[in-house]
């Protein structure tokens, strides 16, 4: 896990800041501590930014009866107590995907965590010390928080188990790193990403979803249906040989090429061209 986290620390912040994603927030700060800042998106939704991995972001989503926390950041001490200071509702921890900047040490504060089973391949390396119960999400299920429903949509690409969560009534969702926050590390392959982008863009258009809050939120870099469509087209172009991308000799994890278009990047390698 340390090696993987080092890789993320090396390539994600530099690439994102190079793309012009400077943190500029308009949301009101409701909690500020040494490890995380929480800001209020609306009356019952908050986003928290950790300080270790390119503003790794977690989201607290509250209903009338209970709340969910999407991701836990890299290392936020006493995260459970911090969250309890924001909402009085019981909180369930859910991961958008299993990577150490989203399921880091902070998950130890919670007795259980829900993940997409496809990311179990990452658990041994990236959640090695978790003693709680691991439970599985179901594609297409709806999480009822009491007066607020959250749709669960599997969106593989960044990882096999990347998952997006949608509040249809509010017109927005939360996508973790599925669409890259502007800088997508494509760990599966182009074909998988194409299908994910087709599915999500169709869903967003059908239900009028305006934006997806990403896993590294910096205030302006929300995912839109246009961006999702663009990513799918970029992946299709790579697969067909229409786009070649550029060599990225500093790329790690085998992602030694990068395609930059429409203000976003796809990091990929030979293994992803299928």
Where are these regions (language model features)?
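Active-site HxH/HxHxD metal-binding segment of metal-dependent hydrolases
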Residues: 75-145, 234-241
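Accessory terminal helices/loops
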Residues: 16-29, 198, 202-274
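Active-site neighborhood of phospho(di)ester-bond hydrolases with catalytic His/Asp-centered motifs
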Residues: 70-72, 90-101, 114-119, 154-157, ...
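Bacterial Sec-dependent N-terminal signal peptides
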Residues: 1-20
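Histidine/acidic-residue-rich catalytic or RNA/ligand-binding cores of hydrolases
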Residues: 167, 184-190, 223-231
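Active-site environment of divalent metal-dependent phosphoester hydrolases
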Residues: 55, 75-78, 98-105, 121-122, ...
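Conserved beta-strand hairpin/beta-sheet module of binuclear metal-dependent hydrolase folds
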Residues: 32-85, 164-177
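Metallo-beta-lactamase
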Residues: 20-35, 39-41, 107-160, 167-169, ...
